């Protein structure tokens, strides 16, 4: 079974197409020639072969260079045709040669670290804030890595001969702070820059176009988009992808084929979902910024469907007060989710480090979905309550916030 890398694959594919078109067709360009409309789901864990010598040669080749085995599939940990379709599609959306999918975003990040560690490049330079578990993985040194935390301006000075990676997240989780990826890539020199693009998605930014060698996604979030699949993926050049495939084979962090199918389907509606949710979020950010019960609103200049805001009252009461919005961790689903980062997503980060990165104890993170914006505002308004106004609040208070604007169409950039 073809995996979609033919006419729509990495080499010799169609002319450059708009993002919306790629989202629908990438990884599927071969289907019509096979008499298919929907992508098939290949659930096989192993594949028959009557030529053991040829199989041995293919396995030896994979062990040597990590290139995907030519010919039919061999074994589920070496690759799966359904997952390969998703990898093809995501790479095209991010503008990279390749993509390698994993069972979760943390499995994907772990594989990146292990690739560099195997080369003796254990030092990582990172900029806070990152997703809480990414922060913990680096800080705790669970995989043998050593991390130096810096401000963006300090990246170049922090590099060492054994630095294998610079890691950033923009917009950042949960503060939505934005970084100049092009300037950071320049500061990295020959050291790979890994940009976590989970919040922005390729609809709003493509880090590879700004010099990032590695683009990380928790595909659980916007790429899947419906809160029913867990996955991670790294979009990158083919050379780095080969090392990632070898690590995936050795450690077993493979993506289930059904998850690969759901992600491929999720990509087809990614642009329209992100733009619609971003429109809702921009409007809610405007209203929150003008609300005297809200101390500060964080909303990125590139737009997006995430809002972070700090309240004067008890943030836990806001969480307890929502009725339409779901009080839950995670993000990027069609329905709206709200959580308290200091209690959940970033609880694992040392409190002083957390606060130093701008994650205050009064900060709430809102993932805006596709509901009607008036219904969402009514729910937020009720959850914020009428008895949580600061003594100094009132007319004339100027909200502290970032610039607010609707996201542009990616095709217009």
From Swiss-Prot:
EC number(s) reported in the record: 4.4.1.11, 4.4.1.2
Lyase found in the keyword field: yes
Group of enzyme by EC: lyase
Matching SUPFAM superfamilies: PLP-dependent transferases
Catalytic activity: L-methionine + H2O = methanethiol + 2-oxobutanoate + NH4(+); L-homocysteine + H2O = 2-oxobutanoate + hydrogen sulfide + NH4(+) + H(+); L-cysteine + H2O = hydrogen sulfide + pyruvate + NH4(+) + H(+)
InterPro entries: Cys/Met-Metab_PyrdxlP-dep_enz (IPR000277), PyrdxlP-dep_Trfase (IPR015424), PyrdxlP-dep_Trfase_major (IPR015421), PyrdxlP-dep_Trfase_small (IPR015422)
Annotated spans, Disordered: 388-413
Pfam families noted in UniProt: Cys_Met_Meta_PP (PF01053)
Alphabetized UniProt keyword annotations: Lyase, Pyridoxal phosphate
Residues reported in the UniProt entry to bind substrate: 131, 365
GO cellular component: cytoplasm
List of residues that carry N6-(pyridoxal phosphate)lysine: 221
Coiled coil: none
Annotated positions binding pyridoxal 5'-phosphate: 75-77, 105-106, 218-220
Co-factor requirement: pyridoxal 5'-phosphate
Gene Ontology terms, MF aspect: cystathionine gamma-lyase activity; homocysteine desulfhydrase activity; L-cysteine desulfhydrase activity; methionine gamma-lyase activity; pyridoxal phosphate binding
GO biological process: cysteine biosynthetic process via cystathionine; transsulfuration
Subunit structure: Homotetramer; dimer of active dimers.
Function: Catalyzes the alpha,gamma-elimination of L-methionine to produce methanethiol, 2-oxobutanoate and ammonia. Is probably involved in L-methionine catabolism. Is also able to catalyze the alpha,gamma-elimination of L-homocysteine, and, to a lesser extent, the alpha,beta-elimination of L-cysteine.
Family statement: Belongs to the trans-sulfuration enzymes family.
Name of the featured protein: L-methionine gamma-lyase
Originating species: Streptomyces avermitilis (strain ATCC 31267 / DSM 46492 / JCM 5070 / NBRC 14893 / NCIMB 12804 / NRRL 8165 / MA-4680)
């Amino acid at each position: 079974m073809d995996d979609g890398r033919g006419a729509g694959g990495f080499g010799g594919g169609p002319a450059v197409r708009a993002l919306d078109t790629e989202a629908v067709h990438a990884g599927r360009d071969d289907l019509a020639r096979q008499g298919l409309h929907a992508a098939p789901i290949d659930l096989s864990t192993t594949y028959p072969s009557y030529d053991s010598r040829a199989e041995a040669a293919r396995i030896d080749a994979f062990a040597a260079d990590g290139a995907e085995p030519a010919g039919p599939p061999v074994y589920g940990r070496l690759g799966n045709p359904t997952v390969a379709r998703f990898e093809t599609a995501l790479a095209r959306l991010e503008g990279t040669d390749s993509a390698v999918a994993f069972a979760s975003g943390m499995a994907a990040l772990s594989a990146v670290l292990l690739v560099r560690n195997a080369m003796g490049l254990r030092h990582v330079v990172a900029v806070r804030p990152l997703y809480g578990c990414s922060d913990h993985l680096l800080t705790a040194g669970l995989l043998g890595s050593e991390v130096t935390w810096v401000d963006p301006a300090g990246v170049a000075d922090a590099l060492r001969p054994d630095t294998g990676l610079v890691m950033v997240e923009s917009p950042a989780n949960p503060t939505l702070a934005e970084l100049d990826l092009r300037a950071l890539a320049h500061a990295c020199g020959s050291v790979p820059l890994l940009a976590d693009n989970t919040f922005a998605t390729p609809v709003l930014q493509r880090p590879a176009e700004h010099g990032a060698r590695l683009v990380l996604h928790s595909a659980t979030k916007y790429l899947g988009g419906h809160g029913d699949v867990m996955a991670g993926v790294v979009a990158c050049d083919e050379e780095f992808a080969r090392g990632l495939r070898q690590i995936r084979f050795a450690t077993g962090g493979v993506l289930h084929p059904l998850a690969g199918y759901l992600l491929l389907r999720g990509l087809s509606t990614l642009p329209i979902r992100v733009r619609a949710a971003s429109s809702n979020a921009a409007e809610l950010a405007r209203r929150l910024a003008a609300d005297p019960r809200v101390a500060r609103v964080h909303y990125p200049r590139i737009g997006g469907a995430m809002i972070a805001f700090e309240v004067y009252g008890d943030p836990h009461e806001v969480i307890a007060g929502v009725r339409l919005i779901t009080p839950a961790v995670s993000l990027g689903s069609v329905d709206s989710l709200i959580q308290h980062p200091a209690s959940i997503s970033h609880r694992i980060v040392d409190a002083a480090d957390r606060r130093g990165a701008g994650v205050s104890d009064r900060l709430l993170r809102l993932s805006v979905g596709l509901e009607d914006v008036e219904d969402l505002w009514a729910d937020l308004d009720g959850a914020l309550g009428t008895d949580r106004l600061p003594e100094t609040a009132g007319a004339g208070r100027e909200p502290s916030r970032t610039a607010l604007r609707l996201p542009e169409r990616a095709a217009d950039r």
